[in-house]
């Protein structure tokens, strides 16, 4: 049994961590930190957690004694605290973007904030769980991937890895629910602004664009650029990413479908849909699954991939726990066996 703490405990990502970790057989939640809710019972903020007796605490790195700290905070928080915690040999799983990008200048361009020191960016293990090499002996700091990159990279990984696509014209059209914007008030997520509305945002400058490009470039061993456009849709949870990519070999639908089935055969959280079927966001709601549908336009050899995840689970807290399991050598689905909630 290990003891963990959660920083940012009043946000959606943290609440999902709590929901999942209280069901984990190998984890005890010792701390839940929130600067804005100090000393308040958690059930006052979230009445659906009436059974929990935790009170929010203020983070003081000197007095913390536990095995792992999860940061479920916005960017520009964890990078100021993580060095002190690492010096105490506390392992970190950071759900924010502070340690995802290895290039400080790129971070500062897209996030508009000063980057973490290069020492800690180099130490961080960016961990798409399906391809992770984390372990308890050598891994101290995990940069948990973002939601859009998770949905996108799981779909693209087999094609880039097998070098069967043209890497200069990857188009990603992604839709997300409003929980991805967090709990803070903002005009674009007010009901009157969002309801019966669909909008593209952060075109060409979304923080997840360089994250996707960084991972694909490392995998391809050459620079990969993408065209990435996110859209906000009037639903609470979910991401649907539709990806268009030119193939550099002649493939039939059956060929590409079989490639994906073989590639993900031993990955419990990636489900490849039957040929001709495509996933919907409701079909992974509340779960750690990523469902992928595949189509080949055989006339012009373009692959069209449809990937769906729950942005708060596989796109955040669920993958963080999956990475925790991998780090400690537990079965990666430990504590993550929840079926999707439907309808």
Swiss-Prot record:
Primary location: cytoplasm
Enzyme type, top EC level: oxidoreductase
Catalytic machinery residues: 147
Keyword field contains Oxidoreductase: yes
One Pfam family from the record: Semialdhyde_dh
SMART domains: Semialdhyde_dh (SM00859)
Protein localization: Cytoplasm
GO molecular function, one term: N-acetyl-gamma-glutamyl-phosphate reductase activity
GO biological process terms held by the UniProt record: L-arginine biosynthetic process
InterPro entries registered for this protein in UniProt: AGPR_AS, AGPR_type-1, NAD(P)-bd_dom_sf, NAGSA_dehydrogenase, Semialdehyde_DH_NAD-bd
Record pathway: Amino-acid biosynthesis; L-arginine biosynthesis; N(2)-acetyl-L-ornithine from L-glutamate: step 3/4
Signal sequence annotation: none
Record EC number: 1.2.1.38
Keywords for this protein: Amino-acid biosynthesis, Arginine biosynthesis, Cytoplasm, NADP, Oxidoreductase
Family, per entry: Belongs to the NAGSA dehydrogenase family. Type 1 subfamily.
The protein, known as: N-acetyl-gamma-glutamyl-phosphate reductase
Species, as recorded: Staphylococcus saprophyticus subsp. saprophyticus (strain ATCC 15305 / DSM 20229 / NCIMB 8711 / NCTC 7292 / S-41)
Gene name in the database record: argC
């Amino acid at each position: 049994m290990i003891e963990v703490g959660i920083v940012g405990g009043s946000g959606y990502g943290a609440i999902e961590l709590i929901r999942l970790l209280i069901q984990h057989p190998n984890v005890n939640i010792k701390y839940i930190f929130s600067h804005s809710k100090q000393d308040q019972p958690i059930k006052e903020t979230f009445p659906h957690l009436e059974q929990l007796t935790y009170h929010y605490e203020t983070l003081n790195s000197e007095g913390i004694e536990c095995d792992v700290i999860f940061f479920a905070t916005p960017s520009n928080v964890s990078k100021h605290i993580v060095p002190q915690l690492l010096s105490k040999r506390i392992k970190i799983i950071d759900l924010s973007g502070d340690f995802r990008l290895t290039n400080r200048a790129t971070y500062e361009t897209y996030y508009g904030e000063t980057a973490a020191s290069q020492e800690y960016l180099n130490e961080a293990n960016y961990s798409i769980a399906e391809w992770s090499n984390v372990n308890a002996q050598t891994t101290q700091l995990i940069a948990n991937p973002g939601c859009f990159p998770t949905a996108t990279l799981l779909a693209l990984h087999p094609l880039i890895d097998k070098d069967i696509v043209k890497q200069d014209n990857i188009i990603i059209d992604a839709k997300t629910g409003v929980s991805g914007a967090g709990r803070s008030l903002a005009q674009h997520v007010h009901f009157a602004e969002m309801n019966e509305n669909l909008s593209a945002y952060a075109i060409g400058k979304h923080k997840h664009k360089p994250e996707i490009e960084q991972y694909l470039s490392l995998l391809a061993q050459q620079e990969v650029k993408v065209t990435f456009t996110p859209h906000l849709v009037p639903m609470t949870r979910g991401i649907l990413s539709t990806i268009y990519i030119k193939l550099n070999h002649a493939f039939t639908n059956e060929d590409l479908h079989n490639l994906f089935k073989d590639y993900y055969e031993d990955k419990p959280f990636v489900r490849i849909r039957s040929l001709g079927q495509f996933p919907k966001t409701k079909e992974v709601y509340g779960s750690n699954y990523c469902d992928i549908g595949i189509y080949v336009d055989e006339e012009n050899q373009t692959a069209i991939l449809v990937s769906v995840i729950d942005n708060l689970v596989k796109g955040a807290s669920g993958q963080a726990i999956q990475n925790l399991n991998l780090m400690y050598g537990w079965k990666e689905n430990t504590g993550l066996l929840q079926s999707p909630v439907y309808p």
